[in-house]
């Protein structure tokens, strides 16, 4: 569970003093498939999320007619609904140098990662996903594969392929696993 309060004490588009609360409930399981079924170096994860509340940036900080560039509460967004956020299997081979992940997950989980140490969206999560309309961050998952190779313990190269499907953003499509609505594929590369 994550809950965030954002307040407007002075200034902004609407300078009335007020606060807004947004939250996210999560339920998930991480599985070590080596311990469960004897599959060497294999893990799986399933995560559901549900977001609720209001964002102080939408009507108090920024002008609602123009929209805002970022959010004061990172946990707000992508609809008030239950979503399948992670549903993947991951396997390491060749002395853990090669790591392959396949399933449903977002680009920001593995590419352009950034810790979330403060509730403002500008300081949280994959920044590409916060500002580019074709890159979906948590809690939106899409069909994906990511292949990472560790060149040295400190250096890796990775490539991914993510189904770019705007219909997954629509209300009621939190568990959509079909490819209908697909516009293409996002292929990030990172060193």
Question: Which functions belong to the PLM regions below?
Answer:
Residues 25-33, 189-191:
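Short, well-ordered amphipathic alpha-helices
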Residues 31-44, 94-97, 154-157:
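Short loop/turn motifs that connect adjacent beta-strands in outer-membrane beta-barrel proteins
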Residues 59-88, 96-190:
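Surface-exposed coil loops of outer-membrane beta-barrel proteins
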């Amino acid at each position: 569970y994550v809950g965030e309060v954002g307040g407007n004490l002075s200034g902004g588009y609407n300078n009335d003093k007020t606060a807004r609360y947004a939250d996210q409930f999560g339920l998930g399981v991480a599985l070590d498939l080596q311990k469960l079924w004897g599959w060497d170096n294999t893990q799986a994860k399933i995560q559901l999320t549900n977001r609720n509340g209001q964002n102080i940036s939408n009507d108090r900080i920024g002008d609602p007619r123009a929209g805002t560039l970022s959010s004061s509460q990172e946990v707000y967004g992508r609809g008030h609904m239950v979503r399948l956020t992670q549903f993947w299997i991951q396997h390491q081979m060749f002395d853990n140098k090669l790591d392959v992940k396949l399933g449903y997950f977002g680009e920001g989980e593995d590419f352009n990662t950034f810790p979330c140490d403060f509730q403002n969206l500008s300081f949280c999560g994959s920044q590409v996903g916060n500002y580019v309309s074709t890159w979906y961050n948590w809690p939106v998952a899409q069909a994906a594969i990511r292949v990472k190779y560790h060149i040295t313990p400190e250096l890796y190269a990775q490539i991914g392929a993510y189904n770019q499907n705007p219909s997954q953003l629509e209300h009621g499509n939190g568990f959509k696993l079909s490819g209908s609505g697909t516009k293409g594929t996002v292929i990030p590369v990172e060193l």
